[in-house]
Amino acid sequence: MDKVQYYRRKSLPLEMHKICIVQKTRIPSVEERVSAIREAGFNSYCLRSEDVYLDMLTDSGVNAMTNEQLGAMMVGDDSYAGSATYYRLAAKIKEIFNKDYFLPVHQGRACEHMLALAFVQPKPGSIVPMNFQFGTSVGKIKYCGGDYVICLQEDGLNRQSSNPFKGDFDLEKLERVLKEQGDNIAFVRIESGTNLIGGQPIALDNMLAVSELCKKYGVLSILDASLLQDNLYFIKTRETAYSDKSIREIVRTLSDAMDIIYFSARKLGFGRGGAIILNDKKLFEHIKTFVSSFEGFPTFGGMSVKEMEAICVGLDDTMDENIIAQGPQFIEYLCNELEDAGIPVVTPPGGLGCHLDAMKFVPHIARKDYPAGSLAAAIYIA
């Protein structure tokens, strides 16, 4: 993973790509911004895109694509059944993840819907332990009559910490839940990395230990690999046992331990879509019935074949250390610069973005008054 190392100064990350197409933008005046945020009810989510100079909200599905991805989109096979595009993507998934069966869906939350229908709905009141919750995940679980238990390790919610893997499971708590709930467990969900606590990663050894507990208690282990790209970088650079392993080797080790993997290809693969992958043919056939009912024919699942071709290339790109290093390295650089300026941020730097610690930034605003939302509105105006 390449960096520029100065003789007297700290290193700087490099952008390992060329930019071929640019899009013009503009900075609205202060008066325009005040008017826009007032019209939006001081809710940055309600701003119009033309009133925003730098969009730091829209992350997935709008990323730039490589020239190889754009080229691949031109060879998509639109056949309703037996599409060559499906088989190309299935072969790529087999190559990288060593999983025999692949179900395409239109995006990550659709994966969660299919899995909740398959494993939660048949057992009303069932429980899904997880390292941390994500809105769409728990929404689908509850919609299908289940509930969830967070088993995040104690340090996970500390906003300032030196713990390199704040997304780890508390293994003792997980085992306690598995013992107490027994047959009432639908599956264990492992989020890699952990979105809502600042993109914090989970260690590979921790995920392998979770897998062993699942095997011990006869429970399915299901990996949400949507944010796996950043997590792979952190395993490679923070987990010394795997520092000499290639990204492909790390992925294979993790994948072999999991019963089912799903992901939003908007994050993993740089395209608009999603996938559920597994090795158990009986489970595959069970989940496939829901894909056919809710998503589309099992060889495209509501995805455009152009996007499927792009994802095929994008998954290969995810195995490139220089590509997956881009986000974490620049996020770390920004976090360090802000910390040097006395601005409170979530540490250690994670994936997704550099997260300001709003509770420390605006301590005079009570939690019930939405300090983070208030801070976002103020930064927009400033």
Predicted regions and their residues:
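Conserved PLP-binding catalytic core of the aspartate aminotransferase-like
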Residues: 344-382
